[in-house]
Amino acid sequence: MKTPLTEAVALADSQGRFLSNTELQYLYGRLRQGAFALEAAQTLTAKADTLVNGAAQAVYSKFPYTTSTPGNNFAADQRGKDKCARDIGYYLRMVTYCLVAGGTGPMDEYLIAGVDEINRTFDLSPSWYVEALKHIKANHGLTGDAATETNNYIDYAINALS
């Protein structure tokens, strides 16, 4: 999985050299940012159920047909609602993985690479997940650098879905 740290090391190694002072300073900054990112991942994990359920409600409010249309791809019954929450939870987990990894590698490899095919195969609307992510962004309760780090990854996911 690619992260800013692994990419810097791979580049230096491919060139047969040690990391430069500039690269080391950048990596030191990334590691310092890591404390904020870990705090954010911890908070999001602790609030995951509340955030996911609130995000699902936001989707149902903005797209009421999702709860009135019968079928495997909608939330008209409890099974459908459980699937919706599961899928939103997956996006939230990807955000926490990116926070821990310090880059978009987890999202790139495990989500974005196949999201179009998954949505097309199962007839899922990306706009549902965009709405869910916007709700999470507006309600995660993080501040400062932790919020900035988190919002960057949420925005990355939103842009990939848009």
UniProtKB/Swiss-Prot annotation:
InterPro entries: Globin-like_sf (IPR009050), Phycobilisome_asu/bsu (IPR012128), Phycobilisome_asu/bsu_sf (IPR038719), Phycocyanin_a (IPR006246). One of its GO terms (biological process) is photosynthesis. The keyword Membrane applies. Its main location: membrane. GO terms for cellular component: phycobilisome; plasma membrane-derived thylakoid membrane. Contains one covalently linked phycocyanobilin chromophore. It comes from the Bacteria. It is a peripheral membrane protein. Keywords: Antenna complex, Bile pigment, Chromophore, Electron transport, Membrane, Photosynthesis, Phycobilisome, Thylakoid, Transport. It is found in: Cellular thylakoid membrane. (2R,3E)-phycocyanobilin binds at residue 84. Pfam families: Phycobilisome (PF00502). CDD domains: PC-PEC_alpha. PANTHER family: C-PHYCOCYANIN ALPHA SUBUNIT, PHYCOBILISOME 32.1 KDA LINKER POLYPEPTIDE, PHYCOCYANIN-ASSOCIATED, ROD 2-RELATED. Belongs to the phycobiliprotein family. Heterodimer of an alpha and a beta subunit, which further assembles into trimers and the trimers into hexamers. This is C-phycocyanin subunit alpha. It comes from Picosynechococcus sp. (strain ATCC 27264 / PCC 7002 / PR-6) (Agmenellum quadruplicatum).
